[in-house]
Amino acid sequence: MLKIKTHIVAVTMGVVALVLLCGSCASDRRMAAEPTVCVSIAPLKYVVKQLAGDMYEVETMTPAGVSPETYQPTPAQIAQLDECLAYIRVGTLGFENTTLRRITENVPHLYQINASATVPPLKDAAGDDPHAWTSPTSLKLMAQEIVRGLAHIDKHKADTLKVTLEAFETEMDSLDAQLSRQLEGAACRTFLIYHPALGYFARVYGLKQLAVEHDGKKPSAAYLAKLVKQCREEGVKVVFVEKEYDPELVAPIAKEIGAKVVVIDPLSDNPKQQFIEIAKALCQ
């Protein structure tokens, strides 16, 4: 009997040691020389890479070509978060809100950074506009939140991150000034877009965004007729359509109002270039 008890104790201690070892391994991976940071969308990856260079591996939760407003992370992705140093979210996306509970339940130690915490929120026809990253000023504010969070959890990199933040802020300020000058000369201050993803961009530069998609749904014939009339009255010359949508969705209305169709990618991993291309299209 004593031998059996001794064996049970030994096995139990072995299991405990294994659990502690696994936890220690996960912790070691999180604090490795090149730890992993997870972000919700590619534009946030761009910001992290501009700030941190190769200091972190950056994994993007939403696959390319998929809408982050409807995407649901897989169980494997959520499990992968156990090895991440931090999870950086936009803070406004549907899947972030629906899966946040699951994330905190399954990975309670995960440090989360709400990148849009200081971005003034914007309302649209469907409610809160989730596209908080779509302007240089928004990216600047997001970068500040990201550095604040990373410096808190990864203190030995704090000084370097603060230096790169200053450089990024200067870059975004310069881009903002460039776009402001450029868009002052835009003949038309109103544009049409299939999915209303440029509300923050429009707010910053005094533009007006009209959307084909209505309340997150395909538009009715009556709504389209009203939209065509408004576009004509306001002299709309550009119709944007996001990369993940078929341009044919806007081709008929563009033809009817005599506007050009321009494909954009608000989820690009180079949002700076996207802002430049959007301004260029509006000024041609």
Question: Where are the predicted features?
Answer:
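Bacterial N-terminal signal peptides that target proteins for export
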Residues: 2-13
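Extracytoplasmic metal-acquisition and chelation regions
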Residues: 2, 25-284
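Bacterial N-terminal signal peptides
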Residues: 11-22
